[in-house]
């Protein structure tokens, strides 16, 4: 936001309408194909509304991405809290199922394509967004969980283990979904993949069951 004053309810409602319209357009027609005038036409807003609230089209996109990232974070957190006193395997499985379901939705692939398109942005919108939103990345849920365990190895390596587990769940599948439109996993495939990853993560190759 350009102003330090708290926006009025009317302004906030208008910004939410702009974000909702922009999200729908980005997902259905692609980021590059949509102009601010397209968003204004359907949202009933104005250029000043967008510039005052989001500064630019890129700013608007990353505001939307911020909202989605927070929504996914809270969704995964709530799923893991449902079995707060569960075993390590149960917690990892619950986290894994919620996490992988998100990345096997068309919306996640569409956003992945847009994010890739921002890599060469000279204004570093993507880099700045990543730097400023680390706290909303889902691996933090696992990192905090690992830090609470009695196992000293988990405590010491909590962040590395959390990032590794998320990477094992997501890659290379999400990259292939984004880059070459590889098929998304169905529910059965998601469950099987999570079970496989949890097994290897907890037991290693030698200790894993065939």
Predicted regions and their residues:
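Hydrophobic/aromatic-rich alpha-helical bundle segments in the mid-to-C-terminal region
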Residues: 147-199
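N-terminal intrinsically disordered/low-complexity leader segments
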Residues: 1-13, 209-210
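Hydrophobic alpha-helical connector segments
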Residues: 63, 77-109, 155-165, 191
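Short helix-capping/turn signature of helix-turn-helix
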Residues: 31, 54, 116-122, 132-133
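Alpha-helical DNA-contacting segments of helix-turn-helix folds
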Residues: 62-68, 72-76
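Helix-turn-helix
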Residues: 17, 21, 25-59, 63-64
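Amphipathic alpha-helical packing segments from all-alpha helical-bundle domains
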Residues: 90, 101, 110, 123-151, ...
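Amphipathic alpha-helical segments used for helix-helix packing
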Residues: 103-126, 174-181
């Amino acid at each position: 936001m350009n102003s330090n004053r708290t926006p009025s309810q009317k302004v906030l409602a208008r910004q939410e309408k702009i974000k909702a319209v922009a999200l729908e357009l980005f997902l259905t027609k692609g980021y590059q194909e949509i102009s601010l005038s397209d968003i204004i036409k359907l949202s009933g807003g104005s250029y000043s509304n967008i510039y005052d609230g989001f500064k630019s089209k890129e700013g608007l996109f990353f505001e939307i991405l911020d909202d989605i990232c927070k929504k996914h974070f809270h969704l995964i957190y709530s799923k893991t809290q449902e079995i707060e006193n569960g075993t390590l395997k149960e917690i990892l499985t619950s986290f894994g199922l919620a996490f992988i379901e998100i990345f096997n939705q068309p919306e996640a692939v569409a956003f992945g394509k847009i994010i890739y398109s921002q890599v060469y942005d000279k204004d570093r919108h993507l880099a700045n967004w990543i730097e400023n939103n680390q706290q909303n990345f889902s691996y933090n849920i696992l990192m905090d969980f690992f830090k609470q365990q009695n196992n000293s190895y988990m405590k010491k390596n909590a962040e590395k283990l959390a990032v590794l587990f998320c990477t094992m769940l997501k890659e290379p599948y999400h990259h292939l979904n984004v880059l070459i439109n590889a098929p998304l996993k169905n529910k059965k495939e998601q469950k099987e993949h999570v079970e496989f990853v949890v097994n290897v993560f907890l037991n290693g190759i030698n200790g894993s069951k065939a």
